[in-house]
Design a protein with these regions (language model features):
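Beta-strand-rich interaction surfaces with strong enrichment in secreted/lumenal proteins
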Residues: 59, 68-71, 128-132
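Short, surface-exposed secondary-structure edge patches
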Residues: 15-19, 76, 129-133
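Glycine-rich, low-complexity segments
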Residues: 1-13, 32-63, 80, 100, ...
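Beta-rich globular "head" domains
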Residues: 51, 65-101, 140-143, 157-163
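Extracellular carbohydrate recognition
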Residues: 149-157
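Short hydrophobic/aromatic-rich beta-strand motifs
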Residues: 20-37, 83-84, 141
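Terminal beta-strand-rich extracellular "head" domains
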Residues: 88-136
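Short beta-strand-plus-loop segments that form exposed binding edges in beta-rich domains
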Residues: 142-150
């Protein structure tokens, strides 16, 4: 089906729509962002931006170093979360990653993947963002500060979540 709109559409703010199995719903809530909830009840923030950045290939052991990946922000963005994952878990030590905007860290507690884990989601110390406002065209760089001591780890990726500002 296609909807053609001439003029404005307004949406009422609600905390969450009721789940309707046979249709999806668009709504806004207190975060002032557009959301979509599908018939199964999965809620997605439509305005969320997600960047996945590879800091290595899939088969080579990770190495410590600055500037493992970089890009310029295509627009200003407010970060809401950062995560990391790898395809081969580190052993013997934790993988630690720093994210920088224009050469300065944006993390007061760096992103980490604990030994024998594949994701930062289970890290004993969660990443803490100290700078969530990324400027348009800012240079974003990624450093690997620590790798596993027995098995370095492989296939490292960092995911940035946020919304345009």
């Amino acid at each position: 089906a296609m909807i053609t709109v001439e003029g404005a559409i307004s949406l009422d703010e609600i905390s969450a729509p009721s789940n309707t199995a046979d249709r999806g719903q668009l709504y806004t809530n207190a975060d002032n962002h557009l959301h979509f909830i599908n018939g199964a009840g999965t809620d997605v923030k439509v305005t969320e931006e997600v960047f996945i950045v590879a800091l290595s290939d899939e088969t080579t052991d990770l190495t410590i170093g600055n500037g493992k990946a970089s890009f310029h922000m295509p627009f200003a963005m407010t970060l809401t979360a950062v995560k990391a994952n790898c395809t081969t878990a580190p052993t013997g030590a934790t993988i630690i990653v720093d994210i920088n905007e224009a050469g300065s860290t944006i993390l007061s507690t760096k992103l980490s993947i604990d030994a024998s884990e594949l994701t930062s989601s289970t890290a004993a110390s969660a990443a803490v963002m100290s700078d969530t406002a990324l400027a348009n065209d800012a240079l974003i760089t990624f450093d690997i500060d620590q790798i596993g001591s027995s098995t370095a780890g492989k296939g490292l990726k960092v995911t940035l979540y946020g919304y345009r500002t």
